[in-house]
């Protein structure tokens, strides 16, 4: 059984979010939660939220199907970060000039699956 969660337009740069996603790819869901909770990077918070949402989605899916739900059997099957919309801002510079500031956003996707059927 698979469950998926997507967070769109998250205000973290894709490059920084990919660092966090690379840490947890292929790991058990409970282990990934521990890694993200203790990671010092700010990008770990939105990735953790998406992972928790995917686990909750798996719980709901299992309840609907009448299957027993075991969080320890879940692992991260697939996870990736896509680039979202870039917000363009300007900062005033000397002699009437302006410099562009790009505020990048990300779309974070996490897919969790249970071990017995997929691995």
From Swiss-Prot:
**What InterPro entries would the database entry show?**
Ribosomal_uL22, Ribosomal_uL22_bac/chlpt-type, Ribosomal_uL22_bac/org-type, Ribosomal_uL22_CS, Ribosomal_uL22_sf
| Protease listed as a keyword | no
Name the source's superkingdom.
Answer: Bacteria
Task: Please list the GO biological process terms of this entry.
Answer: translation
Q: Which CDD domains match?
A: Ribosomal_L22
Q: Which Pfam families match?
A: Ribosomal_L22
Q: What does this protein do?
A: This protein binds specifically to 23S rRNA; its binding is stimulated by other ribosomal proteins, e.g. L4, L17, and L20. It is important during the early stages of 50S assembly. It makes multiple contacts with different domains of the 23S rRNA in the assembled 50S subunit and ribosome. The globular domain of the protein is located near the polypeptide exit tunnel on the outside of the subunit, while an extended beta-hairpin is found that lines the wall of the exit tunnel in the center of the 70S ribosome.
| Oligomeric form and interacting partners | Part of the 50S ribosomal subunit.
- The protein in question is named Large ribosomal subunit protein uL22
| Organism annotation | Bifidobacterium animalis subsp. lactis (strain AD011)
Q: Which gene encodes it?
A: rplV
């Amino acid at each position: 059984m698979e469950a998926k969660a997507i967070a769109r337009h998250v205000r973290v740069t894709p490059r920084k979010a990919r660092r966090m996603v690379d840490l947890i790819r292929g790991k058990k869901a409970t282990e990934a939660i521990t890694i993200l909770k203790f990671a010092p990077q700010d990008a770990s918070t939105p990735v953790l939220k998406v992972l928790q949402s995917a686990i909750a989605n798996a719980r709901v899916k299992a309840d609907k199907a009448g299957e027993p739900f075991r969080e320890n059997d879940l692992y991260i099957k697939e996870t990736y970060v896509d680039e979202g919309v870039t917000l363009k801002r300007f900062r005033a510079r000397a002699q009437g000039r302006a410099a562009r500031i790009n505020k990048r956003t990300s779309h974070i996707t996490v897919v969790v699956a249970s071990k017995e059927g997929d691995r």
